[in-house]
């Protein structure tokens, strides 16, 4: 297939679309992202959260003022420990191309059999489930609460995580089977 100027036009690549991939692999997909919170003590905290696509179960992995590559890799180790027996089900982790996610972060996950899938640049829709949870957390909690410091932020995020994972009505027909 070519155009009048003799250049080849590309056709759509073979294989599933992004949405088909997400639906067919939901049981095996985790998604993570960082978000920031401004604290009343004048500092900014970075929060790393992971969500399971199939169950929408959220894990707030950590809060820090300085998210280094080593800290982020440690949060990956903590995630694997937290997943425990369920870690074998996870096959993919969707993340953005942020500089906080180093090769060590990816290596920790790869050792557990989890392949890192990078989002395209400026394509928040590729990580829409994580972005939606972060947006909900902001609207329902962070925009309505004065947060003094990191210990206070950790406490309210832990409470919100519990509320989200245990007390919210399941969506998309999912049940509490894996919560």
Report the location of each language-model feature:
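Charged DNA-binding/catalytic regions of mobile-element recombinases
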Residues: 1-179
